[in-house]
């Protein structure tokens, strides 16, 4: 039996974590096994790599170093958490995955998309998400929400120009493959966002039940 791999993507402050929990509740209420996880992270080792990636330090991290750390964490995450869950038929809801790598390290840092694609193939093989929800909102709104949460991490400290590139990359990827991506207006009040998610539930349940 093969599970269902759903990723939640979007810039800072888009509400991915909150809505991931909401989707999980709705799916579990229908009797579906759901695994909640996140990137970078998802395993003890990958969470340690996450800390390195997100914690601001005096030494400037080279962009290639950042990219390789992201994929190192992903390799561990896939091997020990995501693939086993999918193999037993679970629905995996992952807060960020490789689309974020294309957006942040590709568009934001200006790294080669071909290099990212090569690492994607090496680490993931043929595994790609079955569905990706892109939570979109204006950059200034997202950064204001992130700031309201408290201390900013290393990525959240980037400026508006960086996050505009990130947003545009997410939108471009969603437009290029509408069969896999669903765009969600995350600038709406939370109740309206969750109404949008409710409208997706019938097809998610059908796919999860095979």
From Swiss-Prot:
Q: Which PROSITE patterns match?
A: THYMIDYLATE_KINASE
This protein's GO CC annotations: cytosol
UniProt keyword Kinase, yes or no: yes
Quote the catalytic activity from the record: dTMP + ATP = dTDP + ADP
Record keywords: ATP-binding, Kinase, Nucleotide biosynthesis, Nucleotide-binding, Transferase
- Pfam families with a match to the protein in the record: Thymidylate_kin
Answer whether the UniProt record assigns the keyword Transferase to this protein. Answer: yes
Q: Which sites bind ATP?
A: 10-17
Output the GO biological process annotations, alphabetical, semicolon-separated: dTDP biosynthetic process; dTTP biosynthetic process; dUDP biosynthetic process
User: Which Enzyme Commission number(s) are listed?
Assistant: 2.7.4.9
Which Gene Ontology molecular function entries are recorded, alphabetically? ATP binding; dTMP kinase activity
Highest taxon listed in the record's lineage = Bacteria
NCBIfam families tied to this protein: DTMP_kinase
What's this protein's function?
Answer: Phosphorylation of dTMP to form dTDP in both de novo and salvage pathways of dTTP synthesis.
Q: Which family does it belong to?
A: Belongs to the thymidylate kinase family.
Q: What is this protein called?
A: Thymidylate kinase
Per the UniProt entry, what species is this protein from, by scientific name? Answer: Pseudomonas fluorescens (strain ATCC BAA-477 / NRRL B-23932 / Pf-5)
Q: Which gene encodes it?
A: tmk
